[in-house]
């Protein structure tokens, strides 16, 4: 068998339908477009809704993107830590038990709003520079956990 002898399998190819070529052809007269109306007479562009403001204009554009690597911290200020009736090492679990942090498993960041009047020993996932300075100035310790 040679290349010029190849043929498609019987019944695998259908001839192209020629529309609008007389009633006897089966697709004559309206050529499968139905009767009357804009779609019967000419093309209608995709998304056209008859003059009504189309969906893609009603919804507006979505700009920018969402960073899949963004870390969203649960934040606690040092002023709130100072008020805690707790003397041990302050960890995210301790903060959850005192309901200063909501989400389980979310990383905790300590921010520097408020005053520290006693030595605090704090473990958290992140500290702001002002929080770190206030805790250390009061004689406490900061430890970054992962």
UniProtKB/Swiss-Prot annotation:
<protein>
    <recommendedName>
        <fullName>Large ribosomal subunit protein uL15</fullName>
    </recommendedName>
</protein>
<keyword id="KW-0687">Ribonucleoprotein</keyword>
<dbReference type="InterPro" id="IPR005749">
    <property type="entry name" value="Ribosomal_uL15_bac-type"/>
</dbReference>
<dbReference type="InterPro" id="IPR021131">
    <property type="entry name" value="Ribosomal_uL15/eL18"/>
</dbReference>
<dbReference type="InterPro" id="IPR036227">
    <property type="entry name" value="Ribosomal_uL15/eL18_sf"/>
</dbReference>
<dbReference type="Pfam" id="PF00828">
    <property type="entry name" value="Ribosomal_L27A"/>
</dbReference>
<keyword id="KW-0689">Ribosomal protein</keyword>
<dbReference type="InterPro" id="IPR030878">
    <property type="entry name" value="Ribosomal_uL15"/>
</dbReference>
<comment type="similarity">
    <text>Belongs to the universal ribosomal protein uL15 family.</text>
</comment>
<feature type="compositionally biased region" description="Gly residues">
    <location>
        <begin position="23"/>
        <end position="35"/>
    </location>
</feature>
<comment type="subunit">
    <text>Part of the 50S ribosomal subunit.</text>
</comment>
<keyword id="KW-0694">RNA-binding</keyword>
<comment type="function">
    <text>Binds to the 23S rRNA.</text>
</comment>
<dbReference type="GO" id="GO:0022625">
    <property type="term" value="C:cytosolic large ribosomal subunit"/>
</dbReference>
<dbReference type="GO" id="GO:0019843">
    <property type="term" value="F:rRNA binding"/>
</dbReference>
<dbReference type="GO" id="GO:0003735">
    <property type="term" value="F:structural constituent of ribosome"/>
</dbReference>
<keyword id="KW-0699">rRNA-binding</keyword>
<dbReference type="InterPro" id="IPR001196">
    <property type="entry name" value="Ribosomal_uL15_CS"/>
</dbReference>
<feature type="region of interest" description="Disordered">
    <location>
        <begin position="1"/>
        <end position="51"/>
    </location>
</feature>
<dbReference type="GO" id="GO:0006412">
    <property type="term" value="P:translation"/>
</dbReference>
């Amino acid at each position: 068998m040679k290349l010029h002898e190849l043929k498609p399998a019987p019944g695998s190819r259908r001839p192209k339908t020629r529309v609008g070529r007389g009633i006897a052809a089966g697709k004559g007269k309206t050529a499968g477009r139905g009767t009357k109306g804009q779609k019967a007479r000419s093309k209608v562009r995709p998304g056209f809704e008859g003059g009504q403001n189309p969906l893609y204009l009603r919804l507006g554009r979505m700009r920018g993107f969402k960073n899949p690597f963004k870390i969203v911290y649960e934040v606690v200020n040092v002023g709130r830590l100072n008020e805690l009736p707790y003397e041990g090492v302050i960890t995210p679990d301790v903060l959850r038990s005192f309901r200063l942090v909501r989400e389980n498993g979310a990383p905790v960041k300590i921010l520097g709003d408020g005053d520290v009047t006693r030595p605090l020993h704090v473990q958290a996932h992140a500290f702001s520079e002002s929080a770190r300075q206030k805790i250390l100035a009061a004689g406490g310790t900061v430890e970054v956990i992962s």
